[in-house]
Amino acid sequence: MAIPVVVVGCAGKMGREVVKAVHAAPDMAVVGAVDRSHIDEDAGELAGIGPIDVLVTDNLEITCAMVAQERAPGVMVDFTHPRGIYDRVRSAIAYGVRPVVGTTGLPPEHIEELAEFADKASTGCIVAPNFAIGMILLQQACLRAAEYFDHVEIIELHHNRKADAPSGTALATAQMIATTGKTFNVPEVSESELVAGARGGMTPGDIRIHSLRLPGLLAHQAVIFGGLGQSYTLRHDTTDRAAYMPGVLLAIRKVLGLKSLVYGLEKII
């Protein structure tokens, strides 16, 4: 039986990719499409795949209630703005619909509260700052490199319509490196910034992140390690949003077997 999937933000760039990917998956079906715009338009037409007989609505509650009547457990995929995501996830869980969230910029306290809510409801939920498999492999390689290098900085580059900085992926990468427990980037000179912020933002793990926002970019990240007489650069480039879809489809399948919130795609690979 096909997994019923609701796509929130279906009119956005990521939402349209999700509609296409889910519709093409043999074990899934788009049964709901939610957005603030393009009401009553066919979600398939918006995604460029032709009509799929699913009309866009702005009412998530009614959509989740409808999905709850399906014989198979439903999943909500949300790649929208962080504003309101907390309430949307709670609404989905209340109806037994499993959320898969790719929205970045969620405050840690909201993630903790959602984890408690999912635990009490014994309902699976996946929140991930990045769904690109290549990025997950990069982060895992960073842990290995961090064993041998004492200096590291992160440069993340995104399109100029990305609202949050640094990216959730860059923050997650810094946090992952910091779990090694090492002290990184001990200064060897007394630094002074001639322009405020020139050295980037410092994370709690003493790892600097530099954020670039430019037209012509999509999503890119470089993690640069430095040591005596050498540097080591790990880089991942996303040139098309289709890169996220294998991870999204994996999360949709995996969330059905969970009873709590999982943060990070690396936890289910």
UniProtKB/Swiss-Prot annotation:
Primary location recorded for the protein, binned into one broad class: cytoplasm
Active-site residues, Swiss-Prot/TrEMBL: H158, K162
Metabolic or biological pathway: Amino-acid biosynthesis; L-lysine biosynthesis via DAP pathway; (S)-tetrahydrodipicolinate from L-aspartate: step 4/4
Catalyzed reactions per annotation: (S)-2,3,4,5-tetrahydrodipicolinate + NAD(+) + H2O = (2S,4S)-4-hydroxy-2,3,4,5-tetrahydrodipicolinate + NADH + H(+); (S)-2,3,4,5-tetrahydrodipicolinate + NADP(+) + H2O = (2S,4S)-4-hydroxy-2,3,4,5-tetrahydrodipicolinate + NADPH + H(+)
Binding residue positions for NAD(+): G9, C10, A11, G12, K13, M14, D35, G102, T103, T104, A128, P129, N130, F131
GO biological process: diaminopimelate biosynthetic process; lysine biosynthetic process via diaminopimelate
EC number: 1.17.1.8
UniProt-recorded name of the protein: 4-hydroxy-tetrahydrodipicolinate reductase
Organism per entry: Gloeobacter violaceus (strain ATCC 29082 / PCC 7421)
